[in-house]
């Protein structure tokens, strides 16, 4: 309590479950401090209740943040949140994954999906915190290692650190070499290659080359795509390749 009173705290981000107690305590001691809630967009029961000013139950929820995968918000929780919380925002699955990856890399901290939602809100500018002293309450590190592996990959994709490219090639010698040289010149790392020339719907003289790359950021991905296009290669989506 004494620390809360003495510190120049500006904003607190919190997920739904504990926010009622946290908000009550903070507002009782420092009513000027802003308190924000964060929910997964696929399980936004309290977000809807807060903004629609009515208590409601979702038909279904869809999020890997199972700690906040709640269809019906608690009645007492809703009453306290309505009184003490300033706003509630939502974050996507990709944003949560990026937050988990950021916590691992920058803070050496393993957070579960629900615990990382406040960090996701901060990273993706969901609320006005620039220039303010802000606290994100990261509550929970209970995440399955198999899920964690997928989350890390998703976070890399979202942050431009990993990308899948599908290229339509003429099936003749030298094409793969040209593509490899362009990627090498751009400084990306190839971690996966799949060469598909056997689909019955594909032109006899053509093939699809699917590459999985490790990259620095979105700017490097664009550089690679632009150079491949300038060299005469056609980039297609995964969905397009799957249809051929």
Residue ranges with predicted function:
Residues 1-13:
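Single conserved hydrophobic/aromatic residue that forms the stacking wall/gate
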Residues 14-23, 43-47, 114-122, 137, ...:
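Short glycine/serine/threonine-rich phosphate/pyrophosphate-binding segments
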Residues 29-42:
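Short, acidic/small-residue loops that bind anionic groups at enzyme active sites
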Residues 51-57, 107-109, 154, 209-211:
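Short, hinge-like loop/turn segments at secondary-structure boundaries
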Residues 54-67:
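N-terminal glycine-rich dinucleotide-binding loop that anchors FAD/FMN and/or NAD(P) in oxidoreductases
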Residues 74-132:
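Active-site-adjacent helical/loop segments in soluble small-molecule enzymes
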Residues 145-244:
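A conserved regulatory-domain signal marking ACT and ACT-like small-molecule sensing domains
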């Amino acid at each position: 309590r004494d620390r809360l009173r003495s510190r120049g705290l500006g904003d607190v981000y919190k997920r739904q479950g504990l926010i009622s107690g946290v908000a009550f305590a903070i507002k009782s001691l420092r009513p000027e401090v802003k308190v924000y809630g964060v929910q997964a967009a696929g399980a936004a029961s309290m977000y809807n209740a807060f903004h629609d000013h009515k208590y409601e139950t979702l038909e279904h929820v869809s999020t890997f943040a199972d700690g906040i995968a709640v269809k019906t918000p608690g009645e007492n929780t809703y009453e306290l949140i309505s009184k003490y919380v300033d706003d509630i925002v939502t974050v996507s699955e990709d944003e949560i994954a990026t937050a988990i990856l950021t916590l691992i890399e920058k803070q050496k901290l393993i957070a579960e999906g629900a615990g990382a939602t406040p960090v996701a809100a901060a990273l993706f500018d969901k609320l006005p915190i620039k220039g303010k002293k802000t606290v994100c309450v990261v509550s929970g590190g209970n995440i399955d290692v198999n899920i964690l592996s997928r989350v890390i990959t998703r976070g890399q994709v979202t942050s431009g650190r990993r990308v899948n490219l599908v290229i339509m090639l003429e099936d003749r010698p030298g094409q793969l070499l040209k593509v490899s040289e362009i990627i090498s010149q751009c400084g990306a790392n190839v971690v996966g290659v799949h060469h598909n020339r056997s689909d019955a719907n594909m032109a006899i003289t053509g093939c699809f080359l699917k590459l999985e790359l490790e990259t620095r950021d979105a700017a490097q991905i664009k550089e690679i795509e632009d150079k491949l296009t300038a060299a005469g290669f056609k980039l297609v989506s995964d969905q397009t390749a799957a249809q051929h």
